[in-house]
Each structure stands twice: as structure tokens, then as C-alpha cells.
């Protein structure tokens, strides 16, 4: 049973956050991702985020993790085209 009703939307919010907060040069840490999810009323644990990100990758999202100076950063590298790009 989900911890909250919004829990079912967690994967969608993760994609939304990655689309809005990252690009090919700038990533987001798991701590930052947790804070962003909390803003949407979704509680999550670091361990579950690893699994969620892996599920999104298996589904076809081009999510890359990179080790930075002190942290590990996740970013959504390739995206759908924006209307302006067409």
C-alpha cells in the first residue's frame, strides 16, 4: 500500500523534475531530488529512488548518473522535441 495517494505518481514526478531541473550539462543529486519530491507531497527514501531511476531507464528514459566532485548527479540527457524546435 502506498505511503500516500501521491506515491503512485512518484515516477511521473521524477521525470518532471529531471526534465525541469537538469540538462546534458547539469544534474541533480538524490538529496535534491528528494526535496523536490517533498514539495509535491511525496515522501521517498534514497533506496527507492535508485530503483525508480532504474525502472525509468528500463522504460527508455535516457537518465545518466555521473560522479561529481563530492556527489553523484543524475540528469535526463535526451528529451522529446519542444514545439519551438519543430
Please annotate each region the language model reported.
Residues 1-86:
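Short, basic/aromatic recognition patches that contact phosphate-bearing ligands
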Amino acid at each position: 500500500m502506498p505511503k500516500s495517494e501521491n506515491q503512485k505518481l512518484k515516477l511521473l514526478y521524477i521525470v518532471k523534475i529531471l526534465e525541469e531541473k537538469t540538462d546534458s550539462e547539469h544534474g541533480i543529486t538524490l538529496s535534491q531530488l528528494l526535496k523536490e519530491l517533498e514539495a509535491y507531497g511525496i515522501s521517498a527514501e534514497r533506496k527507492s529512488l535508485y530503483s525508480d531511476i532504474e525502472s525509468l531507464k528500463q522504460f527508455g528514459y535516457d537518465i545518466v548518473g555521473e560522479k561529481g566532485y563530492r556527489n553523484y548527479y543524475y540528469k535526463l540527457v535526451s528529451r522529446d522535441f519542444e514545439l519551438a524546435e519543430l
